Amino acid sequence: MEINRRHGGPYDRGSADSYYRRPRRPHFFTEATYASDEIEERFMAKQQIAEYNLGFDDNEASGSFKDWG
């Protein structure tokens, strides 16, 4: 499976949710994050959900989390 790591894409959103310690909630943006349409899990293809989960899991495994001080 080839992973699209573009900003706002499913992999990026999964890794960002993990980084900021947000709950797992598959979604992505059609273009720029927060400046374009958000696609919710119910409208995502199986591969897009898998990419989101991979991004989330990769970040969890790396232990790279926001330090809220």
Each predicted region: which residue ranges?
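Intrinsic-disorder/low-complexity detector
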Residues: M1-G69
